[in-house]
């Protein structure tokens, strides 16, 4: 596909969800970026303009953002990597778009740090940028996602560094913004480079199980469809395999091998109204035996990032457990796209009350005293388990840390929540199949680390 064909694809994507977009300015932004990036090349050998085109495609296809966001995505590297200036961009488009481009450029300049205080300052800068215009971080996360998708062209050291940074900064922020689809892909791509052996084992085993599970999901979906149709409930049912990092984390939290984990797939039922959600829950519990302690009502008590759904885990008729998530169409869009969906509703005049769902940003910015500990707690809570996976040199107290020099797959360890690894000995079982039990010794004074 030529670069002009890529741009035509972008135009068609935008036209599908926003036929009133300013296509003249979008094309002018593309031509400006193409001219200024000129013969610049990526590590893959492709013309550099393919990258902003891909980022704009993500912004449009995944997030359905407005014309200004598309323009800014196309131009997001011109101030940083060419001789174009803020004034040039403002004259071409508008001061608002120039502000977005400058905001993304500022985030690009943030250097990855291994010291906790430096890392917290970097996170705070990102939060400050978010508080000014949420579109800055949405474009930046899209930028990082495309870079992770093309990470195979980087050196092994760069792959690990960027994957650590993605796992520590971008995936958690995507989670806090409710952008689950992008969070999952960021996590999976990071895991691919942080633990390539573990990632490949999970993917290969999932591929081997896929025909069996596809058939099982098809039968189960037919059962749910039939019963809901009989009840006269308008609905859509989606079935999916769980993503690799979710399974990887479950293996550690439950101290199991992949062969010992059975709930590898889940269903979503999307309906029109909240009352339908609870009616569907009753139908599901009538069809399948619910597993005690596995029901959560996130409709009555939404998550801090605005996520709403009913969650239940049931035992299937064939003896295999699976999760069912039940939500309305609007809840589904917010669950998939997070703050991007909220922002779109706000633009359409439907956003009353959504600002409060992101009060955590302002709260952290306004209350600097103690904010570090609060943000650390927010990060830790992302994992929702009593054990934390760490991929790096040390795990600071209370933080799900992925920092420091990454020194190979055997450096992967699990730590109990709130425990420092300084002068500690942690016994753990590497949960991937056919691996032996190991212990990690950290000797801080002599800066020696041994994997036994």
Question: What kind of feature is each model-predicted range?
Answer:
Residues 14-29, 86-96:
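Short, mixed-charge amphipathic alpha-helical segments
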Residues 76-81, 85-103, 179:
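Hydrophobic or amphipathic alpha-helical targeting/insertion segments
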Residues 139-142:
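Hydrophobic transmembrane helix module of multi-pass membrane transport proteins
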Residues 440:
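P-loop/Walker A NTP-binding region and its immediately flanking N-terminal helices
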Residues 447-451:
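Short, intrinsically disordered C-terminal tails of secreted or membrane-associated proteins
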